[in-house]
Amino acid sequence: MRACISLVLAVLCGLAWAGKIESCASRCNEKFNRDAACQCDRRCLWHGNCCEDYEHLCTEDHKESEPLPQLEEETEEALASNLYSAPTSCQGRCYEAFDKHHQCHCNARCQEFGNCCKDFESLCSDHEVSHSSDAITKEEIQSISEKIYRADTNKAQKEDIVLNSQNCISPSETRNQVDRCPKPLFTYVNEKLFSKPTYAAFINLLNNYQRATGHGEHFSAQELAEQDAFLREIMKTAVMKELYSFLHHQNRYGSEQEFVDDLKNMWFGLYSRGNEEGDSSGFEHVFSGEVKKGKVTGFHNWIRFYLEEKEGLVDYYSHIYDGPWDSYPDVLAMQFNWDGYYKEVGSAFIGSSPEFEFALYSLCFIARPGKVCQLSLGGYPLAVRTYTWDKSTYGNGKKYIATAYIVSST
């Protein structure tokens, strides 16, 4: 496929030029500087090109980075993560990303800046290698993402999917809620794909959720077994074996069972987006989709989209981005109506296997929680944004996935 425009996020560029400016000292909130090796402007966090000292030098000096209007859940999740009392302990926070709303900090450089919580040394001294989000380099993430890309043998082939992407609009038009595409997005999908074990296990999960937040999720024994079956099937694939091998080598997990248990908690563990206890999870939000305050949130999966469109529940309106890949998986950023509720921009892989998406989102959440994660797929750069759910935790203070989605590409 060919790109019609860039996603509103700019192309992520690795500006590592020798001899260029590499610090934000006296540069906070300046305009983009093409002569600098890294940036200190308000949008560098979204572009993934901030200097290493940006968060420590600049985040106290300006207001929140301006939200990206086409991805409404970004601001929603960012606000949700701050709707709790700022903690004064490092319990469950060792080597988390810097958050200016916290009274004290537990990140890798808090000792350097003298703003650590009092229990930082006692709680975090043994966690630096295994829990620091900076322990896995950008180059390592890009390398493993290429391996995962090559390992996805369950993906759709060119002849398995016929798309009719139709009208490409500008980002300024995404809020208009105008249906510019008279025909469905999917002209044809070879449904034999859905008989593959991971696809079948994935599809079994999609009807286990109530899409409206504020209504508690209550799983039957069969539905809980379906979660285990999905994890069991994807762990048989080369995609997930590549991911586990990488994370095991990075000392993130000591055994495959520990890895699977953590995946189950971070993705399927319930938390509360609305008034009802346990009304949401990372899996429901990202893959199945939710409705909150009259808007579609999450819903970043092509299989779910196809099945709902086939039933007449999804009406495809337009797209603002069509990725550069000439085979599957590809990427599409689209506007649609889901049974009466509008999605301003929903980015999604097209034609990927369930394990492929699950692996990449998990990789980014583990390696870059709450940040932009820069990948490489078939030689093309791609970025994924994750958010942590900070209002509740599991295990020894671990955080659930709030959301994960594609934010940029070339």
Curated annotation (Swiss-Prot):
Residues 1-18 form the signal peptide. It has been suggested that the active SMB domain may be permitted considerable disulfide bond heterogeneity or variability, thus two alternate disulfide patterns based on 3D structures are described with 1 disulfide bond conserved in both. Its cofactor is Mn(2+). SUPFAM superfamilies: EndoU-like, Somatomedin B domain. Placental-specific, but also associated with various malignant neoplasms. Residues 137-410 form the EndoU domain. Disulfide bonds join C24-C28, C24-C40, C28-C58, C38-C40, C38-C51, C44-C50, C51-C58, C90-C94, C90-C106, C94-C124, C104-C106, C104-C117, C110-C116, C117-C124. InterPro entries: ENDOU (IPR039787), EndoU-like (IPR037227), EndoU_C (IPR018998), SMB_chordata (IPR020436), Somatomedin_B-like_dom_sf (IPR036024), Somatomedin_B_dom (IPR001212). Keywords: Disulfide bond, Endonuclease, Hydrolase, Lyase, Manganese, Metal-binding, Nuclease, Repeat, RNA-binding, Secreted, Signal. The active site is at H285, H300, K343. Changing K343A: Strongly impairs endoribonuclease activity without affecting RNA-binding activity. Belongs to the ENDOU family. Endoribonuclease that cleaves single-stranded RNAs at 5' of uridylates and releases a product with a 2',3'-cyclic phosphate at the 3'-end. The UU and GU sites are more efficiently cleaved than CU and AU sites. Targets mRNAs to regulate their expression. Monomer. This is Uridylate-specific endoribonuclease.
